[in-house]
């Protein structure tokens, strides 16, 4: 029912409790670790002392005395993000977030990557943080394609500069493949 931190590495010990709580929709992994540190989480009626504790399927887990249902299977959602929303759970500036606008009844989800506040388009959401990280890593070779509207005229030299990589405000960005779909006036 509970694997201690020094259990086997073969997957039979279950899943770390903070990750399990996050997949169950209780809280983010970081918030779950905080709950554990505060002594609010119990596994098989014993206070969990460390987030390195492992949970087996079917184990009895409670938070603040309330039973937590088993973690959900991994799910992936498509969301059309309109402009004017920020891709974060909490914005210190008080701007509206993607997560505040999701329909009720969804599990707790995280975004796969992000779109800027003024951007709109497809945003993938998942209840599995590890999947989100795998999909975000450039080393995994996922091709990302963006369509943008540019105000002003784009010259061939601008596209060539993007193909070589650019530095913006001291940050170096790698090369990207860019082309024009269409030209409409000054857009």
Model-derived features with residue positions:
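Basic, flexible Lys/Arg- and Gly-enriched helix-loop patches that mediate nucleic-acid binding at interfaces
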Residues: 2-187
């Amino acid at each position: 029912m509970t694997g201690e931190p020094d259990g086997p590495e073969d997957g039979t010990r279950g899943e770390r409790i903070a990750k399990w709580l996050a997949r169950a929709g209780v809280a983010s992994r970081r918030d779950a670790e905080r709950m554990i540190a505060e002594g609010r989480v119990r596994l098989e009626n014993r206070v969990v002392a460390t987030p390195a504790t492992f949970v087996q399927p079917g184990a009895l887990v409670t938070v603040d005395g309330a039973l937590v249902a088993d973690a959900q299977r991994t799910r992936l959602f498509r969301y059309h993000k309109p402009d004017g929303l920020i891709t974060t759970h909490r914005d210190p500036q008080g701007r509206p977030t993607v997560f505040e606008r999701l329909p009720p009844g969804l599990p707790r989800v995280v975004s796969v990557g992000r779109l800027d506040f003024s951007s709109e388009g497809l945003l993938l959401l998942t209840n599995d943080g590890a999947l989100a990280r795998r999909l975000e890593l450039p080393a995994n070779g996922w091709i990302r394609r963006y369509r943008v509207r540019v105000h002003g005229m784009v010259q061939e030299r601008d596209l060539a500069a993007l193909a070589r990589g650019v530095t913006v405000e001291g940050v170096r960005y790698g090369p990207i493949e860019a082309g024009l779909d269409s030209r409409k006036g000054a857009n």
